[in-house]
From Swiss-Prot:
<dbReference type="GO" id="GO:0003676">
    <property type="term" value="F:nucleic acid binding"/>
</dbReference>
<dbReference type="InterPro" id="IPR012340">
    <property type="entry name" value="NA-bd_OB-fold"/>
</dbReference>
<keyword id="KW-0235">DNA replication</keyword>
<dbReference type="Pfam" id="PF17657">
    <property type="entry name" value="DNA_pol3_finger"/>
</dbReference>
<keyword id="KW-0227">DNA damage</keyword>
<keyword id="KW-0548">Nucleotidyltransferase</keyword>
<dbReference type="GO" id="GO:0003887">
    <property type="term" value="F:DNA-directed DNA polymerase activity"/>
</dbReference>
<keyword id="KW-0963">Cytoplasm</keyword>
<dbReference type="InterPro" id="IPR004805">
    <property type="entry name" value="DnaE2/DnaE/PolC"/>
</dbReference>
<comment type="function">
    <text>DNA polymerase involved in damage-induced mutagenesis and translesion synthesis (TLS). It is not the major replicative DNA polymerase.</text>
</comment>
<keyword id="KW-0808">Transferase</keyword>
<keyword id="KW-0234">DNA repair</keyword>
<comment type="similarity">
    <text>Belongs to the DNA polymerase type-C family. DnaE2 subfamily.</text>
</comment>
<feature type="region of interest" description="Disordered">
    <location>
        <begin position="1072"/>
        <end position="1110"/>
    </location>
</feature>
<dbReference type="Pfam" id="PF07733">
    <property type="entry name" value="DNA_pol3_alpha"/>
</dbReference>
<dbReference type="InterPro" id="IPR023073">
    <property type="entry name" value="DnaE2"/>
</dbReference>
<dbReference type="GO" id="GO:0005737">
    <property type="term" value="C:cytoplasm"/>
</dbReference>
Amino acid sequence: MKVPAYAEIGVTTNFSFLEGGSHPQDYVHEASRLGLEAIGIADRNTLAGVVRAYSELGNEDLIHKPRLLIGARLVFADGTPDVLAYPVDRAAYGRLCRLLSVGKLRGAKGECHLAVADLEAFSQGLSLVLMPPYRFQASAIAAALQRLTALESGGVWLGLTPYYRGDDKRRLARLKRVAWAARVPGIATNDVLYHHPERRALQDVLSCVREKTTIDKIGRRLEANAERHLKPAAEMARLFRADPDAIAETLRFAAGISFTLDELKYHYPDEPVPPGKTAQQHLEDLTWEGVAEYFPAGISDKLHATIDKELGIIAHRGYAQYFLTVHDIVRYARSQDILCQGRGSAANSAVCYVLGITCVDPTEIDLLFERFVSEERDEPPDIDVDFEHSRREEVMQYIYRRYGRHRAAIVATVIHYRPRSAIRDVGKALGLSEDVTAALADTVWGSWGKGLNEMQVKQAGLDPHNPLIGRAVELATELIGFPRHLSQHVGGYVLTQDRLDSYVPIGNAAMEGRTFIEWDKDDIDAIKMMKVDVLALGMLTCIRKGFDLIAQHKGVRYALSDIKSEDDNAVYQMLQRGESIGVFQVESRAQMNMLPRLKPKCFYDLVIEVAIVRPGPIQGDMVHPYLRRRNKQEPVVYPAPAGHAGDANELEVILGKTLGVPLFQEQAMRIAIEAAHFTPDEANQLRRAMATFRNVGTIGKFESKMVGNLVARGYDPVFAKNCFEQIKGFGSYGFPESHAASFAKLVYVSAWMKCEHPDAFCCALLNSQPMGFYAPAQIVGDARANEVEVRPVDVSFSDGQCTLEERCGKHHAVRLGFRQIDGFVWADPDEERVRREAGLLPSEDWAARIVAARARGPFNSLERFARLTALPKRALILLADADAFRSLGLDRRAALWAVRRLPDDVPLPLFEAASASEQLDENAAPLPQMPTAEHVVADYQTVRLSLKGHPMEFLRPLFAAERVVTCRSISESRVSGQRMRCAGVVLVRQRPGSAKGVVFITLEDETGIANLVVWPAVMETFRKEVMGARLLWVEGRIQASPEGVVHLVAERLSDRSFEMTRLSDNLAAPRLGELHEPLNDDRREHPDNPAQRIRHPRDVRILPPSRDFH
């Protein structure tokens, strides 16, 4: 007997967040394996996952390709049973998107508030399947069907789902009678929640997370069995053997739906152009106007040909409108004095340069336009433009105003489960205690690894063989990579000529005034929609604020173009010493170590510096050959083809500036084009294959072709193989040369400001936080080391932002602003500008109240300050705790005492204030002086830095007794192999993907910083200490390079954070009998452990957290 075909119309993916237990791609593969006629993906009030299923259908590994039905499960706020809605054609799909947008724009981010009444305006062409719950009232189902059949739709069905609870026969018969009475067909569906029965346990966990309960308390809210998976047609036919029409109806249903995502024909918005001009003509006019502006003396024939070629490709591909859009956005930003700069592959375009979008001069860098746009490649261009991060919102709101929210929205980003979040959610769901889940989660840092191993479980103090722990680890590993929710992209906009909400639903973002679509950048690439990237860059904010400070206090106004990269030798000398804290792109540990080795002397050296410390060049083994050649330790050799197979100098032309070593993506592509005779399109395919080969293994065909072509043209086979291996090492991490050049411009400008105006640079950096590698304490410490005086927060002198004050020696002094006080309410001027333009009320601003009150006369007492500012008592306590009343003659302790005696949040009238003041003076008791060490601790807790000292100063006697040397001693050591001990505050932890598991740690004490290297084996032994310590003790061996780069290679580590709780001015060195080996002393149970004795709330967090990168 022939098995009837079957289409499953009720599939829920994991984009029904915390409900579906399988990826869309999983369903496509399982439906293919089972030979299903079609699958219908219908997630809860969303189309977020459909493009992934659509894209997977193009996978060549699929033996059978089921039809994909695109739909959504409409969940109503008024209690109406769920409805599966499938558009029969393109117009109906647009209506479904708009319906979902209506619901999403009513609610907060992640919500969708729909009522059945909303369907009336959008139901035309939607095939609707009512999905009754397990327990139902026939009258309610009949009423819902009556309401649906009254709509103008593509048809109405009643979903028939077996629940495998022993009553399916009776239940389905009841539903069939309701359907017959309503004159609608019944349709079979397994109402699928996961693609395979093995996913049932994970789906149970997701249900617990969604319901905020545990597996032993969720009860009937869990599915009763593991049957809600995709089933083969034969199994569904067996289940519905009493109603074969329900199976046949699935095929009729699928046949009535013609819509596919192939029908989404994207139309980029038409930009306004002068009368009688096309977009292309207007773009060409702007381009040649830019040429005249940037090159008043004229351009070479080569550059003229380059621009002509680019304009020709833009015309052929129809991208003129896109270039006009980006040009307009950049024009607007500059009209508002917002710094911006294009980067990425767009910097390969001479047209982008003369339009003012990018800063890479085509006469300085050999551009490869095919890296950006190709005649042969049907891919939209992608222009990334960075704007000041504090003012980007002004640009974003301009885009909304210009195009309207129905035509412009931000692209989504899918937030996935990572190891730590997966462990926490699974642990809670399984009923593990918070202590256990925290212990497990704390062994994972960021996105390291794919899950937990047995060693990590043991390090958490848990038994890896405990069945519950083992199950938690197994399920958490399975959950990693699942979508958790949608967020907004960092700045990618989709713009359309028609309504954007007819392509994809639009919803509210968490941030006020922003809306975003449900698809991420990969989704819109698959649909061939174009994206405009409006990105945020903190360094642009810092540079603009620095320029403003220089103009205000030194009378010179600079622009980015005024800072010439070859003018100041002192800047390069500073960088050669590795003095780059705060400098854009070269302040990381690896970059600081590279600077003394590479010794940059010119701008192109900075281009190489930016690019060389990347996983691509490192994994391709390009760094050491380049440095050896640069230092004349190895000859520069350019292989040439044998005989007359080609130009003997072709590789020298390509690799000459990098001494024969390929460092940039463009060089890899040029080698493929010039030496291996790839077409430009094939070269770009090679680049894309290199970016993904570790995941999809598509690079093999390019390897054989490239190596074969090189050998055929007379190149040595060993060279050909090595060349390809080097290029393959780029992976997805190699920089385009144009991108590195864009960033190198900002490297130089920020280095120039640090070198020539360290006062303005420090102040601007502090006012641009959070950004960069280093916390305010290190920024301030570096400025002080460069002869800049930094003054504390004070109510008589500080503003909301940090400011410059009168000169003190060579430089102006930096006054810390109220923004440095943790928890203090102040308003950022840039954000307030956006609020004003949007018609919103100003934000609360305690700092502005202080500044306004100060204009009415000096604060000669705390009581007068409280009366004039009318600040809440909480603000006064924060100021006192930050030691901000020194100018009034009150230190931290005295100020706190005085504040606490003030009435609660009641402004004092004039005479009452005078009386209160007299009473305070009368009753004031002398307070013991607060030790400096306690002040330092309090400074770190309140303003995240201290100008009074470093915590390690006061712990030095204790550590000296343990033969611990200073960080300066480590950094000045030149004896490789020497064993030394060091201790300090952890500033930065890094575990780059290219470092093969090596962790780099930067420690700081009162003398400076020391750099640690922790090899993987040591990391596994001391994972808890490496990841969790704020004050770290380490023993290891010195590793010193000839260039003066020094590391301490760690062998043993100990978390000594508890020592911070015992800080005191008169801390004495321990007696001989109290000396201990840190590794053998479990401080958690030590009877003298100060951490166990001190319970003051201040001791909960003494130091701000380190900055960790991975």
